[in-house]
Amino acid sequence: MKVLSRGPVADAVPLLSILTACDCSVEELERIAAFLETQTLKRWRWIHCPGVDSDCLPVEGMAVLYLPRAPAALRATALEEAIWFLLSRPTLPWVELREDARRGDLFVSRRSLPEGRIGARLNGRRQPCSSAGLPNAPRKRLLLLAPWLEPGGADRCNLDMLRALAREGWMLTVVASLAAEHRWRDRFTALTADVWVLPDFLAAEKACAFLAYLVDSRQPDLMLLSNSAFAYDVLGYVRTRYPGLPVVDLNHMEEGWDDGGHPGRAARCTALLDRHWVVSGHLRHWLLDRGVEASKVEVLHWFADVDSWKPDSLTRAKVRARLGIAPQCVVIAYAGRLCAQKRPELFAASLGELARRGSDFVALVLGDGELAGELRNDLRRHGLAGRVRMLGWQDEAELRELFQASDIFFLPSAGEGIALVLYEAMACGMAIVAADVGGHAELVSAHCGFLVPRRDAEREARDYAARLESLMREPEMLRRMGQNSARRIREAFTLSLFERRLRGLLERVPVSTPCGVCTDSPVPALGAARLSMQWASYRLANGLRCRLDIQKHGRFSRFLERCAKGVFFLRTFGAKALWQKIRKH
């Protein structure tokens, strides 16, 4: 038997023991070693022996990994995930790791060791010691708690901030708490290997324990909460256990649920937070009106990368030729997730009114979502099928080219912080017609476009159509507003200015612990229960969609999700509570 000790402390009890067969070649052993060095787990012992029943194995609390060969495709967090998969399920003797880092279901439970495959076993139920994991490093580390890794404005903000911090030398740890497709996982793992999607490997009741393990092993210098209900649920636990850890939240817009959505939770939990970062002055005033101290709320306006997002006449001509759009035709762009917040029905009604006024235009819908089917029906009802092209989600390069080929950006949202897509649309030289909501007036000046106040839908449609028509009838004003938009971004909302503002915010985060009374601090068990319900209902709805071959985004798909949530709510809280919830809403 050959025993090799790895890690900073050779005589420490290893968190994981690696078992390899005695017939492994030297080349295979080298490949296994190379794989292990890529893992986020750094404390392990390697045992090169002929069998799995060695006298050295039955050690209380030891996790054992059978590794007959080097895996080809396991993500960098696989070993730590395997340990916590087992810790979450103490009665499970074995687990098999699938060799596909792209799959969410990385683990399959086994009752016996899979012959010739990768497997792990946990002897005893001791939790990993706090010193295990990544070694201490002189670089600063951020721990980000987010709900998911999905296309959208909040996740774009998270990515932008992580990139900026990575350029400053920060190390990054990202935790996503909800069950979802996590279509942007690759974008986050491109910045850091330390990305954790909790429902992929963890039992919900262990979520708090795992968060404590991450804090103990990673030793972050700052915890950032970004639109995460779970983060607010466990905030009291975090502040009690780690009083010296600075905690900041990042919020974008007030919402109509739970007395303001996440900003409402932030206001009620302000005693437990060191700082509140918001993306608009509008949201800052909203928080101040709810009793948050002015000194704790700081505005971080976003940006567009003007080296990439800029007017380009050659691209404009190329894209229009590809789409069969005449050079002089006015092109209206509408981009984002097709959901109730973006009001696609008002987009269709406004363009229908514009068409009835005799205006000639082409509109591009750049996005997808649960209301895509309804939007198609609305476009047909308004006679716009030939004028509006639904192009679906675009990658960044394609979206930029389509923006450069467009003249007007139209966004009739029900609510926003400051829509990120406005920064990029303006940088590409588009005039803006958008809803006067949130902090839009902080970005879109009267020289760059029109902001339309909220009214009843029919009147708003006429107002939007009138603004769009005025731009189309006055080409010189349209051109001038587009130029002003691009100039405003170059002068006040660039990446370098954003990074300078972010550095200033980080320098002002206090080291001292906040004190006071939190008016909304649920116990961690409630946060775990909410996670468990969301994970279970998502999996049930997803399974039904697959069995019934139902599209992910659509009316019936949303009905299935509501039914699944109702089933688990009924099972957890009973019929009376469900009826009260239905009556309330």
Positions of PLM-derived features:
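Aromatic "clamp/platform" in nucleotide-sugar-dependent glycosyltransferases that forms part
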Residues: 414
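Short alpha-helical donor nucleotide-sugar binding micro-motif in glycosyltransferases
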Residues: 393-394, 401-406
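Carbohydrate-associated surface elements
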Residues: 282, 303
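Short hydrophobic beta-strand element within catalytic cores of glycosyltransferases
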Residues: 431-434, 444
